[in-house]
Amino acid sequence: MEKLKITGNGPLKGDITVSGAKNAALPILCASLLTADTLRLTNVPQLRDVMTTQKLLQGMGARVMTDNVHEFELSAAQVSDTCAPYELVKTMRASILVLGPTLARFGEASVSLPGGCAIGSRPVDQHIKGLAAMGADIVIEHGYVKARGRLKGARVVMDMVTVTGTENLLMAATLADGTTVLENAAREPEVTDLAVCLNKMGARISGLGTDRLVIEGVERLHGAEHAVMPDRIEAGTFLVAGAMTQGKLVLRNARAADMGAILDKLAEAGAVIEAGDDWIALDMPQRPRAVSLRTLPYPAFPTDMQAQFMAMNCIAEGVGSIKETIFENRFMHVPELIRMGARIDVEGNLATTHGVNKLSGATVMATDLRASASLVLAGLVADGTTIVDRIYHLDRGYEHIERKLGAVGAQIERTGG
């Protein structure tokens, strides 16, 4: 099993190019099911979850061409199987995103209930409720969500903010008869990126970036070209790495406009931030100051950056508190950080860190995608060598993280396999 070996090596300095956003790429890949024409995508990250989605679409009969690892051509003209099997869905929760587009175009879909990260239940009830409101007949049997019917426009009020739920219903509504209104929709930039791509394909979606999306159904969608947005979570992770090592980094292909809450907290920690349309620069001249934060839906602080900021708080000056309000069971990195010398108290969904001068290298185990990133960051500033095990979690969301960090001065290598 592959591992990362990291030895603390001082400040990170240099340029890093940010990859395309995984959480935008996955729904956009699934959107190819909405048309028989070709969808051309660029800036697609080379990640395990992307490859899983590719296999899922190909298993359904779609043609996926990729001459360049970051460019895809997808055609769903020959889709013959409207079932997403457990064998693929169990490894990636985002597989549920084929449900809406498949049902909308073919009138039926069968999708295994998902697996993925072990960070809470993340139920799909909002997806099912919304599709049922649009006229679908839905049953859950033998571990599968089975849906049939011609979709009709409806007003759907989501009980909670759900990114994948919003995306599934958004895609389904593009081909429904009549107008659909999604209330309490997720406002995440990745949802907006999907909507932009769908509009290029001929969809009629308004309200982009707000919590009220209005979709006028059309008879058919056509092909389009779209560049996947930059990954704001990858960008945030590298910026935290720069801050923790008291380094100086410039991120290319990064959009500061999508990262307000993250950049505000880095500035609060003492970082000097500059940004342009497609770049962000960070200079951290001193030890970070501890910050307190609460995870909430966009535009507030993202749950996917919680673990990384906790790693920074572990070596920061002062006491910081982190309240996780999105997912239960998302402090699984805490015992591993404590093994490295961190002082963290957890009570329910609140973690309080007391900054220490130094962490010490240890063998630690990744439990989910963002937890594994926090352990890598901790390893960058620890005395001695840190071994991060189970990095297949990391490969689900970070493209060649060891190469990118190594290019700016980190002593990090992949071993085993």
UniProtKB/Swiss-Prot annotation:
It is an enzyme of class 2 (transferase). Phosphoenolpyruvate binds at residues 22-23. Its EC number is 2.5.1.7. It is found in: Cytoplasm. GO terms for biological process: cell division; cell wall organization; peptidoglycan biosynthetic process; regulation of cell shape; UDP-N-acetylgalactosamine biosynthetic process. Keywords: Cell cycle, Cell division, Cell shape, Cell wall biogenesis/degradation, Cytoplasm, Peptidoglycan synthesis, Pyruvate, Transferase. Its main location: cytoplasm. Gene3D superfamilies: Enolpyruvate transferase domain. One of its GO terms (molecular function) is UDP-N-acetylglucosamine 1-carboxyvinyltransferase activity. The keyword Isomerase does not apply. InterPro entries: Enolpyruvate_Tfrase_dom, Enolpyruvate_Tfrase_sf, MurA_subfamily, RNA3'P_cycl/enolpyr_Trfase_a/b, UDP_GlcNAc_COvinyl_MurA. It catalyses: phosphoenolpyruvate + UDP-N-acetyl-alpha-D-glucosamine = UDP-N-acetyl-3-O-(1-carboxyvinyl)-alpha-D-glucosamine + phosphate. The active site is at 117 (proton donor). Pfam families: EPSP_synthase. One of its GO terms (cellular component) is cytoplasm. This is UDP-N-acetylglucosamine 1-carboxyvinyltransferase.
